[in-house]
Amino acid sequence: MKATKTTYKKDPMGLTPSQIVNELNRFIVGQEKAKKAVAIALRNRCRRKRVEGNLRNEIVPKNILMIGSTGVGKTEIARRLAKLTNSPFYKIEATKFTEVGYVGRDVESIIRDLVEIAVNTEKTLAKTKVDIHAREKAIERILDSLVGKTSSSETREKFKEKILNGELDDKEIEISVADTTPVGGGSFEIPGMPGASMGVLNLGDMIGRALGSSKTKTKKMLVKDAMAIIIPEESEKLIDQEKIIQQAINLAENDGIVFIDEIDKIASTGSSGAKNAEISREGVQRDLLPLIEGTTVNTKYGPVKTDHILFIASGAFHIAKPSDLLPELQGRLPIRVELNSLTKDDMIKILLEPETSLIKQYSALIGTEDVHLEFAASAIEKIADYAITVNLEVEDIGARRLHTILENLLEDISFEASEMKGKKITIDDKFVENQLSKIITNLDLAKFVL
């Protein structure tokens, strides 16, 4: 049955597990066990916040291990969950990390990146609250440049009206704006470790604060461009940076969600001839242990505790098994959920049912050219057939196969749509077969291997 948007009664503890599942059903087909597991985990967070006294700190999240092939919805479930709750969400592949002491990123950068996301989220929220005031201040600065600070109130009011009406958008002015050139080269890059930077020692921030943040430069620009630069500048001045950082750290610590993908790739399979690789993979697992169990990570914003961050790990486990992970790591991922491979019926539902289904997306895109695209039921079934066939014969990449199928199917229409204004195009099973049969005949075609 098609999921529809529902209005829920206000619950002081947020959405109930069944409501969370209903919300996820709007975007994701099937995988009820996984949805149920994340819904319970989310509700338990709300429950924990209402527990009184010291017991609250002892209640830790039950981290989740999702097992399933690529493209079955593992990442999408976690991403939608974070969006639903406005939680800071960070996704990373486990293969990006190496053991501390080896070349590569260390696992603590996960928390530094999560906090960065939380800070940006809080800043954006704070800026929306001061947007009107910031816009007024920006207009005043532009008026100073246009008519001078000593101009009469009548003159300023007249030019202000012109700015608001957009009459002066293309007028060039000379105005002082903040110098955004990085001081000291930004974050300190660790030699021999590409992509790794010291979260605590950010030389750019330290030198910038020491010199003061009032460094400006005069530039010539159009009024509309000046507005785009000055409004964020004024917003920065109006918001309480220290308060935002504290709120962001609290948000990351209590509501943060970390999604570690491809965790099966760092499992030790016991294969011979790869001893160094085995050591490195096991080292990454050991580095993850304190992070998932609960530790304090130093960031440039201050120390961050990971005790109540929800960790969701996932992997296909085609070669390795969950039992190949270190026993200690298995113990820190107590909720284990297996996601089902997608069937033909699932593919049909994915094409049609979600609020942002692929069929709706492509129809909307082509619709911008004043071309009405319609898919017959027979076409949907045929597309699902082809997706399942290619997944079985080449490599199972789940629902992601539908993207490739549809791109090939609609390639000519997408190319010619601008010349077809006012037309209605019906995609039926014969059209699908004509477009895809030759490609499907050769299943080794590189364009079908994503």
From Swiss-Prot:
ATPase subunit of a proteasome-like degradation complex; this subunit has chaperone activity. The binding of ATP and its subsequent hydrolysis by HslU are essential for unfolding of protein substrates subsequently hydrolyzed by HslV. HslU recognizes the N-terminal part of its protein substrates and unfolds these before they are guided to HslV for hydrolysis. It comes from Rickettsia conorii (strain ATCC VR-613 / Malish 7). It is found in: Cytoplasm. Keywords: ATP-binding, Chaperone, Cytoplasm, Nucleotide-binding. GO terms for cellular component: HslUV protease complex. One of its GO terms (molecular function) is ATP binding. SUPFAM superfamilies: P-loop containing nucleoside triphosphate hydrolases. The keyword Cytoplasm applies. This is ATP-dependent protease ATPase subunit HslU. Its main location: cytoplasm. A double ring-shaped homohexamer of HslV is capped on each side by a ring-shaped HslU homohexamer. The assembly of the HslU/HslV complex is dependent on binding of ATP. GO terms for biological process: protein unfolding; proteolysis involved in protein catabolic process. ATP binds at V29, G71, V72, G73, K74, T75, E76, D261, E328, R400. Belongs to the ClpX chaperone family. HslU subfamily.
